[in-house]
A protein has these predicted regions:
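Active-/binding-site microenvironments in catalytic and ligand-binding cores
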Residues: 2-104
Length: 104
């Protein structure tokens, strides 16, 4: 799905204000499903992205970078999807802040 910028930042655009051509971008999928299978708390770091670029080439500005973790395969089992420990803390993969800053 897609969220409008206004959903996250005050005074930003609504979906109807975004031109369709802004939503059609080159795509790269970083597949870390194997790493996630071995580590539920796997976090993509800048080093992971730099290693990917070393093998595949530089990620060009304006490219949409998606993350494949296969976490969605846990659905519809809520317990597996939420993956809570004994203290109720969820454990799931995601992006590290350094990776996001690098991509922006």
């Amino acid at each position: 799905h897609i969220d409008a910028p206004i959903h996250f930042v005050e005074n930003k655009r609504y979906l109807e204000d975004i031109d369709l051509k802004e939503l059609v971008l080159p795509l790269i999928v970083l597949d870390f499903s194997t790493e996630v299978a071995n580590n539920n708390d796997f976090i993509v770091t800048r080093a992971h992205i730099e290693a990917w670029e070393k093998e595949h080439g530089t990620i060009e500005p304006g490219t949409f970078v998606a993350l494949r973790t296969d976490w969605s395969k846990r659905w519809p089992n809520i317990e597996k999807f939420e993956n809570k420990d004994a203290n109720g803390q969820q454990h799931a993969p995601g992006w590290g802040l350094d990776a996001l800053k690098y991509l922006i």
